[in-house]
């Protein structure tokens, strides 16, 4: 395959199209396939030869693909992106003409995946040279993917087996990757609605569903919807294939903070297994109610947490740490009328600096408001009066 002639290559593409062999045709259009390294196929002007053997718009699609292999061989990623855009546009013309059939879905998966990758590469290349607007290439790629998505989503005539709707989730996952990269998470909302209302949502491949739930979970986390976030990320982690350790680790980076905010602390073994010991001190600090240790852990691993986009989420653990510390005070004093001074002493003992009784009241008021403590502050008596039943409700029970 790596040394076939242009004629042989075009003949194979033609046969795949004529026999409706979407999977083989997808390989012939994919940059994961070895044919792209064949110098005989890396051509700057293959149009004439393609027109001789292939019908429009396939001739245009294949010619653009071969021009793309030429651009990649010259490390011209901006040109490769432009060629791949033509590949997707030409494919879409053919795809729309396929009424009530979906054999070409594998081709769509291959060409749209490569489009996103080339847009990413082109973007990085331009940024290194200080050219172009940040996110511009990826946004344009997203527009092309949305055109494909609309064709899939609007296919209401075909029977379920021949429906183009089977392509929706793959495209949504590619769009999620772009929207997260360019920080436009609000654009995910209509796509999530489209899947929520789809009767195929539980029928897509498990790999696609794992990816989808991962991004939906991350979005819910950023929206502070921690219970739906836990649900989605837990689904992804549980159903992610056990051989995909790297992906499982990636899911855990977001699942761990969510679980911790809901009161579930990870074990040392889990952190060790997935090389996430950055969370070890954070976990210990929250469990012990140790603000000093928590701040030190956040500072120590700040670069890692910021790079993962979870630093601000982890900062929310401070209020949980206060709750756990104050719960210890409650257990020590064994009364439902707790002097505010006792909380002040507990903070001072954990080396929290510059704290006074007013700040203690402020922290307690926040904890009561958030439902972490059932009770009220008696300003007259300078006491926290807590409920006799379950004054510190489980974090997982708080909406």
From Swiss-Prot:
Residues 210-391 form the PCI domain. Belongs to the CSN12 family. One of its GO terms (biological process) is poly(A)+ mRNA export from nucleus. It comes from the Eukaryota. GO terms for molecular function: double-stranded DNA binding; RNA binding. GO terms for cellular component: transcription export complex 2. This is PCI domain-containing protein 2. It holds the Pfam family PCI.
């Amino acid at each position: 395959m790596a040394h076939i002639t242009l004629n042989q290559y075009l003949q194979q593409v033609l046969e795949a199209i004529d026999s409706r062999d979407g999977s083989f045709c997808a390989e012939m259009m994919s940059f994961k396939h070895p044919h792209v390294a064949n110098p005989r196929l890396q051509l700057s002007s293959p149009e004439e030869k393609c027109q001789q053997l292939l019908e429009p718009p396939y001739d245009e699609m294949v010619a653009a693909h071969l021009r793309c292999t030429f651009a990649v061989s010259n490390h011209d990623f901006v040109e490769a992106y432009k060629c791949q855009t033509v590949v997707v546009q030409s494919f879409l013309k053919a795809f729309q003409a396929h009424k009530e059939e979906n054999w070409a879905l594998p081709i769509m998966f291959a060409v749209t995946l490569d489009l996103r990758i080339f847009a990413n590469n082109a973007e990085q290349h331009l940024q290194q040279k200080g050219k172009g607007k940040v996110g511009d290439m990826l946004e344009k790629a997203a527009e092309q993917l949305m055109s494909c998505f609309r064709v899939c989503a609007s296919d209401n005539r075909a029977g379920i087996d021949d429906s183009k709707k089977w392509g929706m989730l793959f495209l949504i996952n590619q769009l999620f990757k772009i929207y997260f990269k360019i920080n436009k998470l609000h654009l995910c909302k209509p796509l999530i609605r489209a899947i929520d209302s789809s009767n195929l949502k539980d029928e897509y491949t498990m790999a696609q569903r794992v990816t989808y739930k991962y991004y939906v979970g991350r979005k819910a986390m950023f929206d502070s919807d921690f219970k739906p976030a836990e649900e989605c990320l837990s689904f992804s982690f549980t159903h992610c294939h056990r051989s995909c350790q790297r992906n499982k680790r990636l899911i855990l980076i977001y699942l761990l903070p969510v679980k911790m905010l809901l009161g579930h602390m990870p074990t040392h073994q889990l952190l060790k297994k997935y090389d996430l010991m950055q969370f070890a001190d954070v976990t210990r600090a929250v469990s012990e109610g140790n603000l000093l240790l928590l701040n030190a852990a956040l500072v120590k691993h700040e670069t890692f947490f910021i790079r993962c986009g979870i630093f601000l989420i982890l900062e929310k653990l401070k209020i949980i740490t206060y709750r756990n510390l104050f719960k210890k005070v409650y257990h020590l004093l064994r009364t439902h009328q707790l002097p505010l001074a006792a909380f002040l002493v507990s903070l001072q003992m954990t080396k929290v600096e510059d704290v006074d009784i007013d700040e203690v009241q402020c922290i307690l008021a926040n904890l009561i408001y958030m439902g972490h403590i059932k009770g009220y502050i008696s300003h007259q008596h300078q006491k926290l009066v807590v409920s006799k039943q379950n004054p510190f409700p489980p974090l997982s029970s708080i909406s």
